[in-house]
Regions:
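A cytosolic small-molecule/anion-sensing beta-strand core signal
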Residues: 31, 63, 76
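Hydrophobic alpha-helical membrane-insertion segments
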Residues: 15, 66-67, 91, 111
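Acidic/His-rich active-site region of diverse nucleotide-sugar glycosyltransferases
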Residues: 1-53, 59, 68
């Protein structure tokens, strides 16, 4: 799944399984811990970007793949067991820092200006909710640092953005239906 504020999500995560995902289907992209990629995908799209380190590196590469016309197929018979935050711990300062910084990287690099402006209200709403939530948890400084450090990387991210956007072969109208707007 891909949310308009640049976060990925697990298909069916937190839902009761009543067979709603028992059929093969096209999806936005795969979790890096579960995806199997063809060699030509990496040759055309590029490899995982080291600037992400962990968290949202798969969202970034999935978006780059979508922008170049690649499709991702969900196979219901595939079973993957992945503890997504085992490395740093769920809601640890490191987790918050990397996730929230990397969300900004995804937006800067991959959204066209039109996509950005169409999603602006959702992006701002989620940014504001993050400020409220993580400040309440005592992690407001960590969140602020993540955004500040993302802005410090603006110049190299804009260069990457130019490369990504100039190599895209798919219009926003093909990508938009894959993005969850809420």
């Amino acid at each position: 799944l891909f949310h308009a504020w640049s976060a990925g999500g697990g298909r069916g995560q937190g839902e009761k399984d009543v067979g709603q995902y028992d059929r093969e289907d096209y999806v936005f992209g795969a979790c890096a811990g579960a995806g199997i990629y063809r060699r030509d995908f990496f040759e055309q799209v590029g490899i995982f970007d080291e600037d992400f380190f962990i968290f949202a590196e798969d969202v970034d590469i999935n978006m780059r793949g979508q922008l170049q016309g690649f499709k991702c197929i969900y196979l219901p018979e595939a079973k993957v067991y992945h503890i997504g935050t085992a490395t740093v711990g769920l809601y640890s300062d490191r987790y918050i820092y990397l996730c929230k910084r990397n969300d900004i990287f995804v937006l800067i690099r991959n959204f066209s200006l039109q996509m950005y402006f169409r999603s602006l209200w959702t992006i701002l709403k989620h940014q504001f909710n993050d400020i409220k939530y993580f400040t309440y948890r005592g992690q407001g400084i960590v969140l602020f640092k993540s955004k500040l450090d993302a802005l410090k990387m603006l110049t190299p991210m804009l260069f990457r953005r130019f490369r990504i956007q100039s190599s895209r072969t798919v219009s926003d109208s093909k990508i938009d239906p894959l993005i969850i707007k809420s």
